[in-house]
A protein has these predicted regions:
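Conserved glycine-rich Rossmann-like NAD(P)H-binding loop of the short-chain dehydrogenase/reductase
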Residues: 22-36
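N-terminal Rossmann NAD(P)H-binding glycine-rich loop of SDR-like oxidoreductase domains
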Residues: 9-18
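C-terminal helical subdomain
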Residues: 164-167, 176-215
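Catalytic loop of short-chain dehydrogenase/reductase
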Residues: 70-71, 78-91, 96, 100, ...
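Conserved Rossmann-fold cofactor-binding substructure of NAD(P)-dependent oxidoreductases
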Residues: 44-59
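Conserved mid-core alpha-helix of short-chain dehydrogenase/reductase
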Residues: 48-51, 97-104
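Rossmann-fold cofactor-recognition segment
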Residues: 34-47
């Protein structure tokens, strides 16, 4: 199986890559600057996405994990915070970057036959559970959830399944030291969810440990 993971330089993405390699799968991991085993991909830049697609050429992609994301508005105040450039950068990464990556790799996904797309969103995407704050990140992850649901509808006739996942509150640079679980537990759970993703599950919004999460 050929697995492509965006945002694989650290945290959950890096752990997913390590585990898939340990299982004997072929992994193409990406990072903004590349280097080492990573291929350069800045999902904010359409030309970078196009270059990455050209790098893959005609190679089939069995599983695409859209993991690249940012959370720059943590701790911002409603009065005077959340500047416009922060909105633009976050949506360019967390939403547009996901779409452009999927769009550019459609030929590779189609070549695999029965490919799967996993979009890493967040529990903060939920419209049902909205406690306030982190407006930019919440809005971007809600948009990514909506994007994934609609991709699932459009790609279903081609047999490409799409799942959207909350990876847990994970001890990473983004999640912080007070988070509930480590990257190992998150990656193990996510891999189990990706393995279970099929056409009956397409469009699902699930947590790393298998629970359905409210939209």
């Amino acid at each position: 199986m050929h697995v492509v993971i965006t945002g694989a330089s650290r945290g959950i993405g890096a752990e997913l890559g390590n585990r898939y390699r340990a299982e004997g799968h072929r992994v193409t991991g990406t990072g903004r600057r590349g280097g080492g085993d990573l291929v350069a991909l800045d999902v904010m830049r359409p030309e970078s996405v196009a270059d990455f697609a050209a790098h893959l050429g005609g190679r089939a992609v069995d599983l695409l994990v859209c993991n690249a994301g940012i959370y720059p508005d943590k701790g911002q105040e409603l009065d005077g915070g959340y500047p416009a450039p922060m909105w633009a950068e976050t949506f360019a990464t967390n939403v547009t970057g996901v779409f452009l990556t999927v769009q550019s790799l459609l030929p590779n996904l189609r070549a695999a036959g029965g490919a799967r797309i996993a979009i890493i969103s967040s529990q903060m995407a939920s419209h049902t559970r909205a406690p306030g704050g982190s407006y930019i990140y919440r809005a971007s992850k809600a948009a990514a959830l909506n994007l994934g649901r609609n991709l699932a509808a459009d790609l279903a006739p081609e047999g490409i399944a799409v799942g959207i996942y909350h990876p847990g509150w994970v001890r990473t640079d983004m999640g912080g030291d007070a988070a509930e679980i480590g990257v190992g537990e998150a990656a193990e759970g996510l891999i189990a969810r990706f393995d279970a993703l099929d056409m009956e599950e397409t469009g699902c919004f699930r947590t790393w440990d298998g629970r359905e999460y409210p939209y």
